[in-house]
């Protein structure tokens, strides 16, 4: 066997492993939040970015083995941004045989008309886009709307709300739309962005750049994203542990008196969630909760951790 053949075999092996991990992550999220049910018609919002391409492929893959029957329809919103390559997505979707609809709405023109030059257009653009997608879901008879946000997006939103909004609020894997008519799901909620990046690169999706509108980037979100990536590099497992924390909320040990009845605590009350451990030196596990090393990752050094040592 030639060296090139060996390299190709290894690349295919790694790609298969990566696809299985993404399938497992998506399958677990679907099961945990009951995202997809028998007979669902899922409207997959396809932006042309790595996340939505990956979401569509994994959902199509799961469709073959899922215990329930569901259908998919891909939807792209052509907002008439200058330079938008409108032929790319139809060609790709035709090539893989997926039902799709391209919705053409000149939201770009509306935003440019309403927002002064130099101001961020994202808020108005998002509202317009959301309304069009909700209307399209109704027209297509879709029972669920699938968005391509992943685990890193959810964590970034959590920190954005904590740092700038004063709220302990993230991005839910499943929710009712703000018009009260549609169920929105995020099947990639358990998927790591770096896995999606590697998968999209290997698949060579026809990625459409996301900066065609010329809008300024969300600098606050970019700061949070850079911070989390730095933590992930310096402290392997921290990202997984933080996401696990979002799934293990202890209201009695926070400070929201609307969420927990602190006023009702009196002599003789039951001990809730272990009582007060605040004066004890809290022992933390040597290996971060929820972290599992992949073949291409090294295990973190097993030094003892305590609250004071976490930076």
From Swiss-Prot:
Q: What is the UniProt remark on how the cofactor binds and its stoichiometry?
A: Binds 1 [4Fe-4S] cluster per subunit. The cluster is chelated by three Cys residues, the fourth Fe has a free coordination site that may bind a sulfur atom transferred from the persulfide of IscS.
- Pfam families tied to this protein: ATP_bind_3
Q: Which GO terms describe its biological process?
A: tRNA thio-modification
Which GO molecular function entries does the Swiss-Prot or TrEMBL record give? Answer: 4 iron, 4 sulfur cluster binding; ATP binding; magnesium ion binding; sulfurtransferase activity; tRNA binding
Q: Which EC number applies?
A: 2.8.1.-
Enzyme class, top EC level, equals: transferase
Reactions catalysed according to its record: cytidine(32) in tRNA + S-sulfanyl-L-cysteinyl-[cysteine desulfurase] + AH2 + ATP = 2-thiocytidine(32) in tRNA + L-cysteinyl-[cysteine desulfurase] + A + AMP + diphosphate + H(+)
Involved pathway(s):
tRNA modification
Which cofactors are reported in the record for this sequence? Mg(2+); [4Fe-4S] cluster
**Which residues bind [4Fe-4S] cluster per the record?**
122, 125, 213
Compartment(s) where it occurs, according to its Swiss-Prot or TrEMBL record: Cytoplasm
Q: What main location does UniProt list?
A: cytoplasm
Q: Which family does it belong to?
A: Belongs to the TtcA family.
The family database entries (HAMAP family) matched by this protein are listed as:
TtcA
What the entry lists under PANTHER family is as follows: AMINOTRAN_5 DOMAIN-CONTAINING PROTEIN, SULFURTRANSFERASE-RELATED
Other comments? The thiolation reaction likely consists of two steps: a first activation step by ATP to form an adenylated intermediate of the target base of tRNA, and a second nucleophilic substitution step of the sulfur (S) atom supplied by the hydrosulfide attached to the Fe-S cluster.
Kindly provide the name given to this protein in its UniProt entry: tRNA-cytidine(32) 2-sulfurtransferase
Organism placement in taxonomy: Bacteria, Pseudomonadati, Pseudomonadota, Gammaproteobacteria, Enterobacterales
Its gene?
ttcA
């Amino acid at each position: 066997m030639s060296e090139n053949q060996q390299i190709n075999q290894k690349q295919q092996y790694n790609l298969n492993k990566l696809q299985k991990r993404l399938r497992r992550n998506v399958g677990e999220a679907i099961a945990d939040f009951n995202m997809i049910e028998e007979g669902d018609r899922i409207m997959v919002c396809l932006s042309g970015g790595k996340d939505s391409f990956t979401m569509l492929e994994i959902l199509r893959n799961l469709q073959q083995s899922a215990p329930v029957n569901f259908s998919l329809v891909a939807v792209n919103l052509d907002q008439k941004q200058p330079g938008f390559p409108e032929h790319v997505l139809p060609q790709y979707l035709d090539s893989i045989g997926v039902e799709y609809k391209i919705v053409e709405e000149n939201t770009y023109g509306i935003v440019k008309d309403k927002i002064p030059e130099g101001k961020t257009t994202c808020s108005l653009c998002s509202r317009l886009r959301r309304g069009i997608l909700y209307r399209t879901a109704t027209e297509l008879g879709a029972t669920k709307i699938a968005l391509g946000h992943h685990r890193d997006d959810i964590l970034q939103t959590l920190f954005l709300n904590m740092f700038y909004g004063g709220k302990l609020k993230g991005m839910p894997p499943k929710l009712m739309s703000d018009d009260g008519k549609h169920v929105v799901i995020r099947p990639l909620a358990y998927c790591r962005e770096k896995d999606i990046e590697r998968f999209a690169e290997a698949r060579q999706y026809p990625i459409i750049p996301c900066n065609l509108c010329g809008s300024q980037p969300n600098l606050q979100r970019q700061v949070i994203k850079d911070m989390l990536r730095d933590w992930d590099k310096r402290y392997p497992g921290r990202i997984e542990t933080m996401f696990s924390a979002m799934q293990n909320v202890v209201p009695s040990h926070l400070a929201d008196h609307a969420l927990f009845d602190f006023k009702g605590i009196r002599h003789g009350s039951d001990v809730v969630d272990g009582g007060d451990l605040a004066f004890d030196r809290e022992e933390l596990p040597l290996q971060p909760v929820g972290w599992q090393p992949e073949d291409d990752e090294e295990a973190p050094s097993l030094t003892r951790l305590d609250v004071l040592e976490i930076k």
